[in-house]
Amino acid sequence: GFDCVVVERWVEHLLEVRPAAITVHGRTLQQMYRGAADWTAIAEAARVARDTETLILGNGDLNTLVDAVRRAADSRVQGVLVGRGTLGAPWFFREKEQARRAFVEQVDLSTLPATMWEPPVSLRHRMQVMLDHARQYEAIAGLECFRSIRKHLGWYCKAFPHAAAMRGKMFGVSNVEDVERIVAEFCQDLILEEAAGS
């Protein structure tokens, strides 16, 4: 609903037209992307649609493949959609076949490899992927559209020291050279910091 949860009534109404699938975002329209996704409401949608041919897909707060498998299993949806968890993390789906198998076979999550909990991506690899992304974007879209990639470059800048400062700089880039300069400066500063700390 707009500002309250109306899952049962709404899903029953949607099921009248027998859709192939219904995606439940797990937040009200008023919440948008704020607050935690309501997976209890998503599970309620799955319960309401259980004896139908309509697939229920859940969405919200899926930051690792293990989150996706756990939420799908707990809520009894037939699948999940991942959005913001993949931004700045194109390696998110690296273990997707293992995750799919874990969901289908209802595997004990504690037996899954650590790489599914948090993919091991070095800071160097993150920077390289970001640079590759910027280079490919500029080659395809050209300089006149380069501003459009700023927010995507910003998503790579999370969960490491000084990420916020680097993210702020990414919102001002105009071309690949700007990105390369910022990454080079960041790496140089990091090397100097590490040397001073040892």
Q: Model-derived features: where do they sit?
A:
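Alpha/beta catalytic cores of nucleotide-metabolism and tRNA/nucleoside-modifying enzymes
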Residues: 4-21, 33, 40, 44-58, ...
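Short, small-residue-enriched loops and turns at beta-alpha junctions
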Residues: 1-3, 28-35
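Short beta-strands and strand-loop turn motifs
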Residues: 23-27
